[in-house]
Structure formats: C-alpha cells, structure tokens
Amino acid sequence: MKQVAIVGIQGVPAKYGGFETLVENIIGDNCSPEVRYTVFCSGKDYATRLNTYKNVRLKYIPLFHANGVQSTPYDILSMLKCLHGYDTVVILGVSGCIFLPVFRLLFRKRLVANIDGLEHRRAKWGKFTKWFLRTSEAMAVRYADVVIADNKGIQDYVRETYHKEAVLIAYGGDQVLRNISEERQMEILRKYGVTPGNYAVSVCRIEPENNSHVICEAFASGGRDIVFVGNWERSEYSRGLKQKYAEYSNIRMVNAVYDLDELYALRNWCCCYVHGHSAGGTNPSLVEAMFFGKPV
C-alpha cells in the first residue's frame, strides 16, 4: 500500500477554504484502496483533534496556524515530519516551498505540488512578501516531480514562465449533488430566513481581495436578500463588515457552512450567485455554483 502525505492545508474536516474542500473530495469514498493518506492539520485551528477521519490518518502541527505569516513555518514543519514513511508528499500551496531545495536533499521519493493561483500577484502583499512567494513558487515548480494546475491559465503560466509542463486537473462540481427532499430543502431555507428564488448566495473568505465590502455595500443599497457565507470572525476586516452591516436584515452574514445538505439547498433555490474574487486560482465554490446553472 502506498503511503501519501498531504501538507499545506488547515486540515480536515474542512472548515476553511478551497484546498481543504479539495482534500475532502480526495479522501473518504474516493480513496483508492491501494493508497493510505495522512493529512497534516493545524493543532491551533482544531479544538478537537481526531486521530482518523474518513479512514485517513490525521497528524497535527501544534505550534502554528496554517494561514497568514505562520503558514511558512507550518508547512516546513509538516514537510519535516514527512521525511520517513511516505512514498509521495503532496504540497498544496507554495508558502513553505522555499524549503524545497533542502527538503529534496532529504526526501528522494515522489513530490507533487499544486501551486494554486499566483499568490505573489495579490495586491495585499508588500514587496518582500511578493518576492518571497514568487521565489517559493519557483522552487515548487523546479523541485516537484509533478506540478498541478487547476485551470488552463495556470498551466499556460507555468509553461511560459518556467518552461515546464504542469498537469491540468480542473475542479468538478458534481460532488454538490445531494439526495435531499424538497421538504427538507424548504426547512433549510426557513432556517436562513429566505424564500425560493428571492435571494442571492455568496460563499468566500471575507477579505478585501474578494471584494466582500463591495458585495455588502451593493446589497445594502439594493435591498435584495443575500446569504453571505464566510469567515466573519477571522480578521479585523471581516468583523468590521459584520458590525457595519448588522442592521441590514437582508444581508445574512453566516459563518462557514460545511453541511452539504444546507449548501445544496441554498444554491439550488437562489436567484443568482455572487462572486467577487479579484485574485487567486480556480475557486471551488464558484465551480460548484455554476453546476446549478445559476447566473453568476
């Protein structure tokens, strides 16, 4: 049985973003019986530490959060714990890939890297951070046996910039389908205080680059209902928006929803999906929303 380690995410069960959702759809019933996965998780981000989840081993890095400035030491420490006992290491994101020249000297087996969405081009980063992420990205492409791109734009970028062929593995959307009765779906809509076809949905991390403030401002002035799902308690920016727009009853600011039945019902009966991202790679939530054939 092949032993595969996955590093670079907050962890599972998923409660954060796209890579976490990706891993949720790799493991479980989708696992090959010939592969044993180990997922490295942030001990700081999980109050309850499971030993296994969906027949996958979980190991925790206790000292760091998986995101922000701590993501680099978090990823590097995760890699160091992969030096023995694994046939393949899958790295999601480039934060810790600055370490790959050293890691490659110590780990001689298969290394797979998904470089995500040109992190160094995000407007929120300063010059040093952009340089650091650009260098980490270059190390990921150079030292990985396989580079994964989740859309053709990233695949073309890798080819043109690094003269290396990335493997294109696009996100799907069929995993959102649920065998759930219409009666149950109506119960879910009532829980969120909306009626079929009379509300919009948006699912994202609440941050400036996703134009969360623009979305709130638009719905505050327009009056249409929106169920806005995101991490509203994570940052000063998100908490500020939540406080500013708390008086608008049509803006339902909901913390991250990972109940697939609830997400299905909300998307299935909305009038449209609102997508404000201005940076990053392919957004899985957008792909999932498109699967319902709703206006975006």
Model-found features: residue ranges?
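Conserved donor-binding/catalytic core segment of Leloir-type glycosyltransferases
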Residues: A5-V7, L189-N210, C216-V229
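N-terminal strand-loop element at the rim of the active site
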Residues: K2, I9-K15, D29-A66, G153-T161, ...
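Acidic donor-binding loop of glycosyltransferase active sites
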Residues: A265-G281, K294-P295
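Acidic anion/phosphate-binding donor-loop and adjacent secondary structure
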Residues: K124, G172-N198
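Nucleotide-activated donor-binding/catalytic signature segment of Leloir-type glycosyltransferases, i.e.
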Residues: G230, S238-L260
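Membrane-proximal helix-turn-helix segments that form the acceptor-binding/catalytic region
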Residues: L80-L83, K130-V147
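An aromatic- and histidine-rich active-site surface loop
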Residues: S71-H84, T88-D116, G281
